[in-house]
Curated annotation (Swiss-Prot):
Catalytic-site annotation from UniProt: 10, 136
The name this protein goes by in its record: 4-diphosphocytidyl-2-C-methyl-D-erythritol kinase
Source organism (scientific name): Listeria innocua serovar 6a (strain ATCC BAA-680 / CLIP 11262)
One MF annotation (Gene Ontology) recorded for this entry: 4-(cytidine 5'-diphospho)-2-C-methyl-D-erythritol kinase activity
Catalytic reaction list: 4-CDP-2-C-methyl-D-erythritol + ATP = 4-CDP-2-C-methyl-D-erythritol 2-phosphate + ADP + H(+)
Length: 291
């Protein structure tokens, strides 16, 4: 059996950290949505008991360091699977960008393996299993738009993000998520209005969504990396209704109603930033296939 499955990137419309928990993680409230910038995974069931990864991108491991490999190994051990799998990954999501590319790939792998190994697991079961690998994989299992709480693994679905244009720009720098969280001072930062964001999404109110964007991690990342702030400022100067860093960065995204204005923002970032994308909220228009 062979299947292909998409793994869309995500952005944080709002990201709040409330306090540091006893387990070392922060208690978070994040409103996230998937976008139509996506990787694609091709899975082939093997008779041999082995996991083979083939990543069509540089600097991405093909061994146990890869979340896809960890997802496959977790399912094999949990359910005593004696079959193997070959997974080929066609990468489009930037690496280490704050867009959950690795987590989305792992989520897609879990869903694909559930099919080719005929496990019969529900989405809820896959999401619960995924939390053993990473905090934000559960959201990627569900996709769409949702509120994530706890350390990011507790998911409450929300209506789809209203139609708009999204321009993403990733500078050529890397950001350490653990370092950003370690330096975050939750008592000395402006917190986003998560309730207002949820209300705006439920009402399909784009202006309310634009006004409610916020990310407490900007207080650290933008201070340490002025280039990220310059990208955000440039987006707003070219007409973005809202601009925000995704996750711990370094990618910044702009939210824009009109195509012509989005194109102006996109063109204004090209040449200023190496990786620039113009996308839409995820619509699941690209179907997964099974052969």
């Amino acid at each position: 059996m062979k299947i292909s499955i998409t793994a869309p990137a995500k952005i944080n419309l709002s990201l709040d950290a409330l306090y540091k928990r006893e387990d070392g993680y922060h208690e978070v409230e994040m409103v996230m949505t998937t976008i139509d910038l996506a990787d694609r995974l091709f899975l082939e069931r093997l008779d041999e008991d082995k996991i083979v990864l083939d990543v069509k991108a540089h600097f991405i491991p093909e061994d146990r360091r890869n979340l896809i490999y960890q997802a496959a190994l977790l399912l094999k051990n949990r359910f005593n699977i004696k079959m193997g799998v070959r997974i080929t990954i066609d990468k489009h999501i930037p690496v280490s960008a704050g867009l959950a590319g690795g987590s989305s790939d792992a989520a897609a792998a879990l869903k694909g393996l559930n099919i080719i190994w005929e496990l019969g697991l529900s989405i809820e079961e896959l999401a619960e299993i995924s939390s053993e690998i990473g905090s934000d994989i559960a959201f990627c299992v569900y996709g769409g738009t949702a509120l994530a709480t706890g350390r990011g693994e507790k998911i409450s679905a929300l209506p789809n993000m209203p139609g708009c244009w999204i321009v993403l720009a990733k500078p050529s720098i890397s950001v350490s998520t653990p370092t950003i969280y370690k330096e975050l001072q939750v008592d000395n930062v402006e917190h986003p209005n998560t309730e207002k964001m949820i209300e705006s999404i439920k009402n399909g109110d784009l202006d309310g969504i634009f006004a409610s964007t916020g990310n407490v991690l900007e207080s650290v990342t933008l201070e340490k990396n002025p280039q990220v702030k310059r990208i955000k400022d440039r987006m707003l100067a070219f007409g973005a209704e809202a601009a925000l860093m995704s996750g711990s960065g370094p990618t910044v995204f702009a939210l824009i109603k009109q195509y012509s204005r989005a194109k102006r923002v996109y063109n204004g970032l090209r040449g200023f930033c190496e990786e620039v994308y113009m996308v839409r909220p995820w619509s699941e228009s690209e179907n997964d296939t099974i052969n």
